[in-house]
Amino acid sequence: MSNKPIIAWWSAGVTSAVACKLIIDEFGADRVRLIYFKIDSAHPDNERFIKECEAVYGKKIEIHRSAKYTDQFDVASKTRYINGPNGARCTLELKKNVRYKVEEETDFEHQVFGFEYDKKEINRAIRFIEQYPTAKAIFPLIENKITKPQSLHYLENVMGIQRPAMYSLGYSNNNCIGCLKGGAGYWNKIRVDFPETFAKMAKIERERDRQQLSEEQRGAGVS
């Protein structure tokens, strides 16, 4: 029987929190490494959520961060790229690159992801396995046919943990405040709930547009 560690990615979201609990129940806390990508734009309530999850898991959650960027706004400001056909640049810089580093440094048995039992998420899991075959990904919620609403129920009624504040405010995820992949409705809600975050994003967009216009003018020989 293998004693290689199992890496479980804890995102401060409900589904990942439940997936981590299921995998600890299956393999034992000693074999599971819980890892969280921390960013500066997370809701302060996440600190409470981390501590309560750690108490239920019986072990600490490791904190990992990007060496280059503090949050999605830092990525957007420095790269001048917000979102596009290939997705948001912040996903690569704040999550994927950090995950790649852990993968390179660890001889692991599996990696655990909190994709819930939902048609869209099942297809996402299939694409993930095809795209990253060496990740050795497993999806406890899909395997156990646990949906997101069922995960919320499990978190609060089985684990005894109150849902993160962002869910209580009506958001569907808890990765960050001010998701660059959010649509107009999402950002209208951010403007009401977190006006400082909305203003920060608007400033970054204005600065990016000014820089692009200046470069276009220089390229056209306009002084």
Please place each PLM-identified region on the residue numbering.
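Nucleotide-activated chemistry modules centered on ATP-dependent adenylation/adenylyltransferase
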Residues: 1-223
